[in-house]
């Protein structure tokens, strides 16, 4: 199977974190660099999905102007419009997601499904920012294009999705506030 393009999702505005989560340091480097490096080991090319007002030193796919204000789904629209094919997406919110988890996700890919996405068995929800999205998912996405807010989670629930379980449940812990950030830094420093 051909290698996928890798999309690093870094465009979200983090009100709770009060800083750009892509610039947080984990693993001795900014999180966006860590995720880009990880994706480069498994993907044919790596792109960073972000807002128009953000600037990074790697290949960016900026949210399309007509997608402004629709939330994270802007990254999916922009990636499909720019690339025109399937991709693996990894959000910067998951500092414990590693290369083994990425390899597992890619190995578990089902190209006949609309998507292959990590599933959180504890919450019963998909982790949309950790998945592989086939071109057929774009067709589903387009049917929601004129909604004021587009939920990738909702589209996944109405699609053919391969549930992929993480090798380690901690890999899908999302860091969303300063307290969680400090806690994860402490646990990483103890290793």
Describe the role of every protein-language-model region:
Residues 1-128, 132-137, 143-149, 157-172, ...:
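Nucleotide and nucleotide-moiety/phosphate-recognizing core
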